[in-house]
Every structure is written in C-alpha cells, then in structure tokens.
C-alpha cells in the first residue's frame, strides 16, 4: 500500500484548495472529500442558502475527470429528470424501454440532490439501488454507474413513518450546518466575488481515475487493531444501554469502519487509531437529540479510554491507597504521644508529656492540614507549660497558627491511641507530630509505582502525538484528548508532591 507522508500532504493541500472561499465550512468540505475519496454518501441538514450546493459543486474539482449532476427535488419531480428521458427512438424502432443517461445521474461521478425527501417513491427506490450497488437498470441491461460521491441535502429530517428510513440509513456521513457566525467570516462572505464555477484546485493535486481505483483497494488493507475494536465495541455497548440512543444497523457500523480506514489511509497510516474513531460522531446520529447524545458518549470514550486515561487514574488511585496505608502506619510511629498518669477519683484519666520533651516551646505539625480560624494550618506553636497544664487540668489552651501572629484558642484532644490531635469547627481531626519525626521518605516500592505511571503516561502521549495530524477530525476534539492526558499528568504530579 502506498500510505506515505506525501499522500497525506497532498490530500491536505487538496482539501485546503477546496476550502478556499467557503467560510466556516472546513469540516464539511473535509468530510465530503473523505466521502468522495472512499465512495460514500453525505447528508447535509440545514436551512436554505448556506452553501450546500456550492460544497457539492466544489467537490467535482477534486477529480481530473469527473461529471457532476445536481437537481432540486419537488413532489412533482419525475425519474426522467434525474435518471434521463426515455429514448423515443429505441421505444419506437425496437420496442425497448431505455433511458438517455448522458448528463444525468447514471453518468455522473459527483451527485447533489437538494430537498431529497420531497422525491417520490419511483426516484427514491431507483436511487437506493444506485447507492447500494452502484448499478442502474436501464431497460433490459444493468449498467455500472461511476458515482463517487452523493451529497443529499434538506432543511428537514425524513418523516419517521414516511418509508424513508432505508435511504436515510445509506447516508453514512450526516452533517448539521448553520449560517456563518463569525463577524470576520461574514464580512469575507459578503465581499467575495469569486464564482462557484471557478476551479481552485491546481492540476497536480487533483485525483486521476487510476489513483482513485487503486486507493479503493488500498483502503481495504488498513488494519483495525485490537485497541480500536475494543473502543468501537465499548461505544456500541454504551449506546445500547441508553434508551434515548438511536438504532444503528450492523450495515452502518460496517460502512463506518471503512470510513475510518479511509481516514487513516489518507492521513498516511496503515491502521485505525483512536483519533479516527472520533469520526463516528458524524455517522451515528439520527436527529438533534441523538446528535448531542452521540457526541457526549464519544467525548467520554476518547477522554477516558482512548489513551488509557481512566485506567491510569485507577492505577494512580491504587498507588495512593498504598501510600495512605503506609502513611497511616507511619503516623502510628510518628504521632506525638502523651502518657497516662492515672485517674482523678476514678472518673477520668490524666495525661502528661513524655520526659524526653525538653524544649520550652513546641512546634507540632498537623499530619493533615485543617482550616482553623479561616486559615489553612500546617503546624502549631504551643508553650510546653501551657500544654502540660492542659493535659493535667483541661480547660482552654492557646497556640500560634503556623507559628505566626497572636495565639488562638485550640480544640485539642487525646485520641484513644494516646495521640495528641486537633479538631476544626466541623470536628475533623488531624494528629500532631514533632517535625523531626515526620520527615520520612516513601519506600522504593511506592516511588517506583509513580515512575511506572509516568512512563505509561509518556507512552500514551507519544502514541497520541504519533496519531496526528488527522485532517478529518476537528482540532477541538483533539484538544479534549490533550486536556484529559494533561489532567492525568497533573493528578500524578499532585500525588507525588503530597507531604
């Protein structure tokens, strides 16, 4: 297969040429080009006057030798207007029912049918066969048709009970278009005087018939790796579990896979990647509500599973659990402990400081920071005599928060393990320890786990970088993946830097 960087660069330049003079239609042009290069159909949904027909006309110039046919359907349209008139000569002389197809759909490579759902059953049934089999029955013969791209357009969706489901299912790519939104683009649109009949494509970029035929064979050899299949299957399972999800036929999944193969091929790759799978957002929806649903499910898929983001976070959680267990064990050893001295009249134990405490002023570190008096507190400064008096007699005790300012009232307690602790206003407690006892490096077993996570994350980022660029996927979707990987990196870093 000739999957090279040169091919990817050529297709990118071809797309940019086709996009010239069309504003806020970059994604639409690129997907229509992908459909044309892989022999698929596109449905454009949107109000009148938003360049739907111009997009279809522009795609003709992607090929060196391509005929185009376009037609605006009405409820009065006849098959003769789409597939060609009957040959009176053949009917009169030979009694044959034959159409004159020159200049009509059966001899066109690029086809644009506007207001598609207004066509009658005779047109739609013939069109269905043409899309399915790329064949057209003309009298007693059945001819192969050269159609590479069918662009169907409408300002409405097909009626649910109108018998149009089979044809709608053949429209693999579905795009929802709107008017130009950005001020600068709207200005450029108004002052642009170029004709939609002008060819913006340099001859060297246009596709020959031989190249097109060869590429159809090459696309079939693009691999679906196990990770790609698992992602697609996971998406299918997610959608099957949702009541509001659209029905997606096996045929549509199969055709969508070939589109992903084509995306990989024309981006210079020999296998489908998670980035290509983003294209399913334009293949699986049925109406506005399911468009939103599909996009949401795909976003979850690519930001949680495409590059092992959720798996990495789960393993990080496991490492953090090990770390917390280790720190709890260390807390038992490091905590500032007091000694039982006995009880007063059998009612209550009293405590005293260990004899090893010699300093007159104690700096005690909170093993977990708390908010005290509207300040995040990491350590306390308490006078030894004040603490000893509190242990003996109870009452009020005061200390400096983080060792600065005036002394503040403290809510100290001795827990059931004889550890000195402090509580905040919500009664959340944190055990206190002496600074010199608290500095304790993590064991190699845990630090190695963090390093392993960092290595796995770097590998996933390398793969993500390797899978780019992808001409047919909007940059904002790639940014979602990058943001999710960055979030994983930040969580790992935060865990490593925790005291």
Swiss-Prot record:
Its main location: cytoplasm. It is found in: Cytoplasm. Its EC number is 3.6.1.-. Keywords: ATP-binding, Chaperone, Cytoplasm, Hydrolase, Nucleotide-binding. One of its GO terms (cellular component) is cytoplasm. It catalyses: ATP + H2O = ADP + phosphate + H(+). Component of the RavA-ViaA chaperone complex, which may act on the membrane to optimize the function of some of the respiratory chains. RavA functions as an ATPase. This is Regulatory ATPase RavA. The lineage of its organism: Bacteria, Pseudomonadati, Pseudomonadota, Gammaproteobacteria, Enterobacterales.
């Amino acid at each position: 297969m000739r999957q090279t960087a040169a091919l990817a660069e050529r297709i990118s330049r071809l797309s940019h040429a086709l996009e010239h003079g069309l504003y806020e239609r970059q994604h639409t042009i690129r997907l229509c080009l992908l459909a044309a290069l892989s022999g698929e159909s596109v449905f454009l949904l949107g109000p009148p006057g938003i360049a739907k027909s111009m997009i279809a006309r522009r795609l003709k110039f992607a090929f060196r030798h391509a005929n185009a046919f376009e037609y605006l359907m009405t409820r009065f349209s006849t098959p003769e207007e789409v597939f060609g008139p009957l040959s009176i000569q053949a009917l009169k002389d030979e009694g044959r029912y034959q159409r004159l197809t020159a200049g009509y759909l059966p001899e066109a490579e690029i086809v644009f049918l506007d207001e598609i759902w207004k066509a009658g059953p005779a047109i739609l049934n013939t069109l269905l066969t043409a899309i399915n089999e790329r064949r057209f029955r003309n009298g007693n013969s059945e001819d192969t048709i050269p159609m590479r791209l069918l662009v169907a357009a409408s300002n409405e969706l097909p009626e649910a009970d109108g018998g149009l489901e089979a044809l709608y299912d053949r429209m693999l790519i579905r795009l929802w278009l709107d008017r130009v939104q950005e001020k600068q683009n709207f200005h450029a649109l108004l002052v642009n005087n170029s004709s939609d009949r002008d060819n913006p494509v340099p001859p060297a970029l246009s596709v020959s018939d031989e190249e097109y035929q060869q590429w159809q064979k090459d696309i079939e050899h693009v691999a679906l790796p196990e990770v790609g299949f698992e992602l697609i299957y996971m998406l299918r399972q997610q959608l099957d579990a949702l009541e509001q999800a659209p029905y997606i036929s096996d045929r549509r999944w199969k055709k969508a896979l070939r589109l992903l193969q084509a995306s990989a091929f024309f981006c210079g790759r020999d296998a489908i990647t998670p980035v290509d799978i983003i294209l399913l957002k334009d293949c699986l929806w049925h109406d506005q509500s399911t468009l939103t649903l599909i996009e949401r499910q795909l976003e979850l898929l690519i930001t949680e599973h495409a590059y092992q983001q959720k798996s990495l976070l789960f393993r990080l959680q496991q490492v953090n659990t090990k770390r917390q267990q280790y720190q709890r064990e260390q807390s038992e050893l490091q905590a500032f402990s007091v000694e039982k001295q006995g009880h007063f009249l059998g009612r209550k134990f009293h405590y005293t400081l260990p004899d090893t405490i010699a300093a007159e002023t104690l700096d005690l570190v909170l093993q977990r920071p708390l908010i005290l008096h509207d300040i995040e507190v990491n350590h306390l400064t308490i006078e030894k005599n004040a603490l000893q008096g509190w242990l003996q007699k109870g009452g009020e005790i005061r200390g400096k928060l983080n060792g600065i300012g005036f002394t503040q009232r403290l809510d100290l307690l001795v827990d059931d393990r004889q550890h000195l602790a402090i509580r905040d206003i919500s009664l959340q407690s944190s055990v206190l320890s002496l600074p010199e006892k608290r500095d304790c490096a993590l064991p190699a077993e845990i630090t190695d786990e963090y390093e392993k996570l960092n290595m796995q994350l770097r590998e996933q980022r390398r793969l993500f970088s390797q899978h780019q660029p992808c001409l047919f996927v909007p940059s904002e979707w790639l940014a979602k993946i990058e943001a999710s990987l960055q979030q994983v990196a930040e969580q790992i870093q935060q865990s490593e830097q925790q005291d």
